[in-house]
Amino acid sequence: MSKNNKKWRNAGLYALLLIVVLALASAFFDRPTQTRETLSYSDFVNRVEANQIERVNLSADRTQAQVPNPSGGPPYLVNLPNDPDLINILTQHNVDIAVQPQSDEGFWFRIASTLFLPILLLVGIFFLFRRAQSGPGSQAMNFGKSKARVQMEPQTQVTFGDVAGIEQAKLELTEVVDFLKNADRFTELGAKIPKGVLLVGPPGTGKTLLAKAVAGEAGVPFFSISGSEFVEMFVGVGASRVRDLFEQAKANAPCIVFIDEIDAVGRQRGAGLGGGNDEREQTLNQLLTEMDGFEGNTGIIIVAATNRPDVLDSALMRPGRFDRQVVVDRPDYAGRREILNVHARGKTLSQDVDLDKIARRTPGFTGADLSNLLNEAAILAARRNLTEISMDEVNDAIDRVLAGPEKKNRVMSEKRKTLVAYHEAGHALVGALMPDYDPVQKISIIPRGRAGGLTWFTPSEDRMESGLYSRSYLQNQMAVALGGRIAEEIIFGEEEVTTGASNDLQQVARVARQMVTRFGMSDRLGPVALGRQGGGVFLGRDIASDRDFSDETAAAIDEEVSQLVDQAYQRAKQVLVENRGILDQLAEILVEKETVDSEELQTLLANNNAKLALLV
């Protein structure tokens, strides 16, 4: 409803209420006082017989008579009984008899005037209830209704052409849309329409965008709702809303129902703490029944999205409810290149902006990250009063997205600046001289976020996609993390070592313990996984992880972790000691320029015959 229509509706309602109030006031407070005197029937007959009355006006139904007042005042009113001798008495005494004609208009007017106020009150109450039912402030009569947004002719302004970098997921949903448009081509071969598609992937990979594209392409009614909109504070509301949603969907079949963040209502049953669990389970049970229960729902396709498939109930995940599970993962290099092309539309880019280079520098970025990256670059260009976005703004935006904005107003003393420079130079130098490790992308001692300085590495595309990390890579990772702490020890002495490496030490301890207890990379303990990994209690898992090893094994684990950390420490220290001159030069450049990129670092290493780290 438009704002003008809503305005006129409210004005009409207020006018109706004003009329009701005025009518009640006029009926109860402005009623005229009764000034006509009455005369009893006996006195009336006596006066007629005494020849004191010469004229009488009878009503049409002969129930009342009006008698002239001798004093000249208003006539007397006489209520007449059913007396058949009355006319004879009047004629015997020569009384002039006049009968008032019967008026139909007066009869209907009396009926209308009698019913006017009750009808007006009923109409006013009806409109008040209608407004309370549809208004945003009071939902007392609408709790059981579904809150799904319905688009009979989808106008999301998003098509599959706007979705890039996730071709496999797009193919799966394109087939679903094709099934809705050309069902005969599939049914002739005996194929059945899939009942549900579950989109699974990390946040920001484009799951909701895919659903919008389906709405834009399908040409069928599209219902969209969030999983959190089912359950309210009242018992039974969630199940009622599920029923209402599917009743609307069945009435508009074929159609698509999109449930975003389905993990809010589809979590595992029978686990967790708290009193709200039963209501959520009741809602989930109703959802399971509607999706594939005793009654079918032919023509309704459920598309759901979640980034927590591990907490979903197994009954919800089975074929027949969600026939397809589409993984929407982080895009690879080619996917990032396509996504950057899509988000670069409408932005004025300089000639030096290389989208290929940006795509290579951003492994692990999702579609939302890349969109935010170009938007931050555009904001920086506008802040600097530029007419186009250059590569400098893009580079600054990458740093801003990864580590937060620069803290240019923070003044660093020369001593602290030198300390941070050596710390970051230690990380970078060890990383650059470790065999088969991620290349250094950038070194900076400009404070960002909670960090005093940062060293960026470009992760390997293959390692990120496969999730497979070798033993040598993990050992190199620990050595690189220890490089900053060791550089402080070499330059300033063990007594001047700071707490700046606390996060690095936590990372080293975590990697070493995982190598021993999860990955079986301990020579002493062998290829075994120790310690049963359990999830949180609210995710439907055990309250605590079980310890499935003895105290002696725990002591051996601690010894192995300490040995791995010590080996990484010795390797990193050897690299920095053998390349002490390069370490000093790199720190001096950082103090002077505050930022060193990968090209400058490679030039420095090549000109000084850097010595690589020894293999383990």
UniProtKB/Swiss-Prot annotation:
Residues 31-108 are lumenal. This is ATP-dependent zinc metalloprotease FtsH 3. In the central section; belongs to the AAA ATPase family. In the C-terminal section; belongs to the peptidase M41 family. Disruption phenotype: A homozygous disruption strain was not identified, suggesting this gene may be essential. Zn(2+) binds at H423, H427, D504. Its cofactor is Zn(2+). It comes from Synechocystis sp. (strain ATCC 27184 / PCC 6803 / Kazusa). The chain crosses the membrane at residues 10-30, 109-129. InterPro entries: AAA+_ATPase, AAA_lid_3, ATPase_AAA_core, ATPase_AAA_CS, FtsH, P-loop_NTPase, Pept_M41_FtsH_extracell, Peptidase_M41. The lineage of its organism: Bacteria, Bacillati, Cyanobacteriota, Cyanophyceae, Synechococcales. Pfam families: AAA, AAA_lid_3, FtsH_ext, Peptidase_M41.
